[in-house]
């Protein structure tokens, strides 16, 4: 009997040891927030199809083991709605989690209020209730500037720790500069505007930029336009149709592969467009795309 009890005690201790090793691995949840806009409260914005990206991205994420996916489209993707989604994601996240965030919609350059940009302009995501021009209904508070986004991502990084990963995919365009004139085909849908959101008044003289401790993959370079492909975002279409080929590759190799696809006859549009990779790179995307 004593021998049996010792054996049971030994097995229980062994199981407890195994559980302490296994549980931390199981705790690494794959979480995502996917935002897409094809409608805007202010009808001055051009019609795009960012909302059509969302179901495609969700299917891709589910195929890669993501179990916690929040989506916001059109009227639900207000500034407050997006901020709430960020805060909820931060509250739910745990050490070591794998995070995917995507924004598909309009982008715009807006007045840099804290002086951290050399050109005096911040990049901003455009929520449903943001206006194209400064007005009484939107004095800039409805835009989601890159400074605000960085604050949420910094909090998220603190929550998941260095062992976690954050990938931010931006299928938008912030510039829409004079190269727009090169696109004479009215059937080409462009995500981006050539109007800066100008906030009157004095700005802070200077401020340091926060460290980007996450990976950002954008649909185009700062000076380029983002053209849609077959009614969805070009970057989104390429990701959902090619991610299986990204498994096990470095972020730079994945970027190179995406850039090469951009140049194929199938995707090459009337104006030049190349993706942009920035921030904390290494093997972030290979952890996102890990199912063969």
Question: How should each PLM-predicted stretch be described?
Answer:
Residues 1-2, 289:
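Short hotspots in intrinsically disordered terminal tails
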Residues 2-12:
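Bacterial N-terminal signal peptides that target proteins for export
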Residues 18-292:
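Cysteine endopeptidase catalytic domains of the caspase/legumain-like
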């Amino acid at each position: 009997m004593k021998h049996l009890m010792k054996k049971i005690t030994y097995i229980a201790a062994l199981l407890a040891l195994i559980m302490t090793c296994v549980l931390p691995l199981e705790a690494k949840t794959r979480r995502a927030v996917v935002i897409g806009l094809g409608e805007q409260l202010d009808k001055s914005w051009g019609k795009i199809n960012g909302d059509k990206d969302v179901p495609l991205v969700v299917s891709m994420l589910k195929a890669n083991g993501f179990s916690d996916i929040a989506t916001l489209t059109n009227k639900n993707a207000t500034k407050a709605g997006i901020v709430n989604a960020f805060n909820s994601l931060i509250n739910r996240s745990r050490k070591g989690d794998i995070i995917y965030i995507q924004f598909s919609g309009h982008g715009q350059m807006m007045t840099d209020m804290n002086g951290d940009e050399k050109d005096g302009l911040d990049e901003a995501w455009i929520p449903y209730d943001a206006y194209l021009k400064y007005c009484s209904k939107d004095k800039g508070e409805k835009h989601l500037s890159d400074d605000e986004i960085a604050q949420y991502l910094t909090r998220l990084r603190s929550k998941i720790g260095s062992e976690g990963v954050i990938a931010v995919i931006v299928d938008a365009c912030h510039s829409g500069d004079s190269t727009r004139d090169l696109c004479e085909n009215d059937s080409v849908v462009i995500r981006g505007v050539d109007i800066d959101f100008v906030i009157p008044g004095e700005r802070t003289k200077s401020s340091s930029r926060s460290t980007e401790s996450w990976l950002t993959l954008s649909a185009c370079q700062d000076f380029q336009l983002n053209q849609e492909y077959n009614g969805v975002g070009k970057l989104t279409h390429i990701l959902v149709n090619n991610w299986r080929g990204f498994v096990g590759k470095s972020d730079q190799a994945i970027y190179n592969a995406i850039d090469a696809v951009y140049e194929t006859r199938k995707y090459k549009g009337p104006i030049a467009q190349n993706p942009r990779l920035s921030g904390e790179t290494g093997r972030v995307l290979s952890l996102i795309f890990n199912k063969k």
